[in-house]
Amino acid sequence: MVNPLAGEVTVTVDGVPHCCKLTLGALAEMEATMGAESLVDLVARFETGKFSSRDVMALVVAGLRGGGWDGSAADLLRADIEGGAVGAAQAAATLLVRAFSPPS
């Protein structure tokens, strides 16, 4: 069970639900993968709709790793993500919102 107030999101990979969370380490890895200069640049890509499928993949991988998953981006390329590309993009957007919004 995920805790939205802790920034957690569920992503189901190959039928198995995983807890995702953008930890500081996961964010740093994601910045490097996405070639972002800063967290603001990274968030701006999603806010303006100028993100690629690579960006979504990097965000989902970072969230999965932050939640304790030990897989790789290569593993995720071959996996079935519940909801497909749309489900992955929604999970990525939700991860960003929950990571950078104060709990209400």
Spans of features found by a protein language model:
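Short, surface-exposed, low-complexity cationic segments
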Residues: 24-41
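A residue-level signal for conserved active-site and pocket-lining positions in enzyme catalytic cores
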Residues: 60
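Short capping micro-motif at the N-terminus of alpha-helices
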Residues: 20-22
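Charged interaction scaffolds used for protein-protein
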Residues: 1-12, 17, 36-54, 65-104
